[in-house]
Each structure stands twice: as structure tokens, then as C-alpha cells.
Amino acid sequence: ALFDHAACFSLEELRELHLIALNFCIRQINVSNRSYFHEALDLYREGLHKDTLLENGYLSRFTYHNIVAAGLQCGELTWVDHFMDQYKNAMERTYRDSTYSFNRAKLAYARGRLRDALGLLQTANYRDLLLNLPAKALALKIYYELDEPDVLQNHLTAMRTFIHRKRVIGYHRTNYLNLIRLTQRLLTINVFDKK
């Protein structure tokens, strides 16, 4: 519906309208109104079709991540797979490989291919802190689901050290330290004990 009267607007005006609509959807998602994932995915698809998501000819890594996240939440795994390949080279070279690899890992995880996801996470170089921590969190989930408590314990220790060494600021630090603490608690109450 946003693009029904696209001819009345310049590309820049369409881009601004599109971003307003996407930001609304993201705010709704952030307050647990998950039905807006479908709205967001529709907006992303239309934006890709109309080129309103490109900035200076590039698709930002954040937009790429958000598109993948919306697609995965909507269960559109095949579409996400095609999107990732089609738009990989639309990202700036600096973040291209790590962003692509991380999102490939998320797709593998969504498909239940945990070992494949882990392999993708372990081979990529995540110099970007905003990507490194989510990659570590995904690895944490995989170790837990693979029932590997020793590996998980080592991962938690390394992750805590990383967070303290990098001096992660604000709520990121708190959120990831809470994730570590709660996972550690799960380990100590023997959740891996199937008896």
C-alpha cells in the first residue's frame, strides 16, 4: 500500500516514507508485537524491489541483518536463502563476508543444522563488536542444544573474558553478562542430566 502512489514521490521521498514505516514496525516488534515481522518483511521486499533501501548504492549491514531476521521469524527460509545470495555484494566490502557468514549461520540454525551453523560461526572473523557478541550468543545456544556442557562452560568463560576485555558499554554489556549468568545457572542445576 505504501507504494501504490509511488509515482507521486521522488525516490528520496519514497525512501523516507519507507524508513518511517519500517521504524514503526521495528518499534512494534521491540515491544513484543511479533505480528509486525510480516509487515516489516513485506516492506523490506517492496523496498528491495523499488531500491529504496540502498544508501549511496549500498545495502547497510544493519538492513541486511534485519531483513534476514524478519524472514526467519516469518518462516521464509527459502526466500531468506535467495535474498542472502542475491544481496551479499550489495553490502560494503568491509562487512560483507562476516555479515554474510553470520546470517548463513542463523539460517542453518533455523533449519536445525546446528553443526553447519557452528562451522560458519567458527570460520568467520567477527571484528565488528555488534556482530561478534550475537555470534557468540548463537554459538552458546548451539552448544546448549547439542548437549555439550564442557564446551559450553569453556565458551561461557571465554565470552565473559571477552566482554570484560572489550569493555562493552551500556545495556549490551548487561544483557550479555545476564545471558552468561543465566546459562551458567542452567549448567549448575544439571539440565543436561537426562535422568
Give the role of each language-model region.
Residues 1-3, 32-45, 71-83, 109-118:
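Helix-turn-helix repeat elements of alpha-solenoid scaffolds
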Residues 3-14, 45-57, 85-95, 122-131, ...:
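Solenoid-like repeat scaffolds
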Residues 11-31, 57-69, 99:
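Amphipathic alpha-helical repeat scaffolds of TPR domains
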Residues 20-24, 62-66, 99-106, 110, ...:
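"A position-specific structural signal for the A-helix of alpha-solenoid helical repeats
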Residues 26-30, 72, 109, 144, ...:
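Specific register positions within alpha-helical solenoid repeats of the TPR/Sel1-like families, i.e.
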Residues 37-47, 51-72:
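Loop-centered beta-sheet repeat module
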Residues 98, 112-138, 143-155, 162-163:
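Active-site-proximal binding-pocket segments
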Residues 157-195:
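Long, ordered, amphipathic alpha-helical scaffolds
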